[in-house]
């Protein structure tokens, strides 16, 4: 980690990568590391995949965000939450005391600007294209990651919507792109929202 909260940026990815490397090289480890999580935690799996560790063997993103830009802005329109989402996460580092100034590094300040600028300027914002490209982990992982993927995604999820799995830049379908690239891809997809799934084995038979 860079010590500066950069909200899904390269610094955050480096911190996750360091954890994967540590786990994969311990004497008690077989060298096979997996990451799973839901929503933002699911994004950490893609951040690790984009770093390309030899020890990361599989990821299980559960309604995990794959690319921050399309989460907040797609089809020529910005979501209302894009104005405040970065600020909400940035505010989580504040204790509202004199030490807060120590946390106001460049990445944090950039994050506070990112949402309102994308909301107000949309595709007319070339600087923020760089910001969001850095946070498109699914694009960076393709061809870099050497493990398998097991996607868990609810089709009724309005928080991390299915576009994060089946979308992509114009002409791109991420789910199919990984299959076409030779990755081992599986998934559990169904009619639920952003939540951990609780399905007993017999409930999936025949599906």
Task: Pin down the residues of each PLM region.
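Cap/lid segment of the alpha/beta-hydrolase catalytic domain
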Residues: 1-18, 22-24
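Alpha/beta-hydrolase fold nucleophile elbow
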Residues: 28-39
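Glycine-rich nucleophile elbow surrounding the catalytic serine of serine-hydrolase chemistry
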Residues: 38-47
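Accessory cap/linker subdomain of secreted extracellular hydrolases
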Residues: 47-144
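Short beta-strand/loop motif that positions the catalytic acidic residue
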Residues: 151-153
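Conserved alpha/beta-hydrolase "acid-adjacent" motif
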Residues: 159-171
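Catalytic histidine neighborhood in serine/cysteine hydrolases
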Residues: 179-195
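Conserved small/polar residues in nucleotide/adenosyl-binding loops
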Residues: 197-204
């Amino acid at each position: 980690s860079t010590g500066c909260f950069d909200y899904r940026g390269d610094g955050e990815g480096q911190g996750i990568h360091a954890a994967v490397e540590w786990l994969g090289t311990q004497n008690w480890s077989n060298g096979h590391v997996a990451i799973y999580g839901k929503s933002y935690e699911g994004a950490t799996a893609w951040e690790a995949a984009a770093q390309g560790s030899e020890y990361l063997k599989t990821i299980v993103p559960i309604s995990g965000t794959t690319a921050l830009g399309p989460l907040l802005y797609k089809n020529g329109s910005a979501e209302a939450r894009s104005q405040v989402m970065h600020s909400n996460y940035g505010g989580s580092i504040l204790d509202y005391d004199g030490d807060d100034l120590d946390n106001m590094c460049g990445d944090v300040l950039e994050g506070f600007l990112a949402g309102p600028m994308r909301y107000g300027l949309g595709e007319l914002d070339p600087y923020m294209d760089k910001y969001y490209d850095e946070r498109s982990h699914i694009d960076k992982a393709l061809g870099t990651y050497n493990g398998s993927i097991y996607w868990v995604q609810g089709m009724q999820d309005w928080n991390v919507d299915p576009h994060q799995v089946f979308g992509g830049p114009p002409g791109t379908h991420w789910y199919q792109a990984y299959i076409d690239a030779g990755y081992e891809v599986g998934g559990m997809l169904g009619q639920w929202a952003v939540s951990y799934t609780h399905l007993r084995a017999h409930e999936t038979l025949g599906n």
